[in-house]
Design a protein with these regions (language model features):
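Single conserved hydrophobic/aromatic residue that forms the stacking wall/gate
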Residues: 161-173
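Short, amphipathic alpha-helical "lid/cap" segments that border enzyme active or binding sites
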Residues: 115-119, 150-157
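Catalytic binding pocket for nucleotide-activated donors in carbohydrate/polymer assembly enzymes
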Residues: 56-135, 142-144
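A structural signal for short secondary-structure junctions
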Residues: 19, 46-48, 70, 96-97
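Nucleotide-activated donor-binding/catalytic signature segment of Leloir-type glycosyltransferases, i.e.
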Residues: 1-45, 101
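Acidic donor-binding loop of glycosyltransferase active sites
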Residues: 44-61
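C-terminal alpha-helix
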Residues: 124, 155-159, 163
Length: 173
């Protein structure tokens, strides 16, 4: 036993990164700042080399990592407990990993369902042809483009001009 749940599970599942294995796991439990002593590459340099990212957030007000992933044309799996996942669910014509982002429903009580959803999505993605993956990457980048500030600022203006000012709030007491 290694005293690390991730490494123990990888060993239990027989995921040993053998040459014949179709899935390779890179597990680096540290911040990728280019000086980690393992990969010595910055996070964004590593992200560019990924086929698919998985961020099964339990709670994030927004969730920048899946957005960063799709901004770099890397399809991603996230959950609806991240603001980004909720936002993606609100998009029209967004139907899962084939459109660049798979959003899984997550709660306090569905750990196994989320794990199965991740497994199933990775398995589905691994069957895609190079041409299909190229198209999925393009769609992932299109999702990221919709999250640019030039599209979101309108909502901030709406809040700014429709919310009561602090002065108005004091008067209503």
């Amino acid at each position: 036993m290694t005293h690390d749940q991730v490494l123990d599970m990888l060993k239990y599942l027989g995921m040993g990164n053998r040459p014949e294995d179709k899935v390779k796991v890179i597990f680096v439990p540290c911040y990728q700042d280019g000086k980690d002593g393992i990969l010595n590459k910055h996070y964004y340099d590593l992200l560019l080399g990924e086929d698919l990212s998985v961020y099964p957030s339990y709670y994030e007000p927004w969730g920048y990592t899946p957005l960063e992933s799709v901004a770099f044309h890397v399809p991603t799996i996230t959950t609806d407990l991240a603001g980004f996942g909720l936002w993606v669910n609100s998009l029209k014509n967004q139907h899962g990993i084939n459109d660049g982002v798979e959003v899984l429903h997550r709660s306090d009580y569905n750990y196994s369902e989320v794990a199965d959803g991740i497994k199933d999505t990775i398995a589905l993605f691994s069957t895609k042809t190079d041409a299909e993956i190229k198209e999925i990457r393009k769609r992932a980048a299109q999702v990221a483009e919709q999250a640019l500030w030039k599209h979101f600022i309108q909502y901030y203006y709406c809040l700014l001009y429709t919310s009561p000012s602090p002065r108005d709030m004091r008067r209503s007491r």
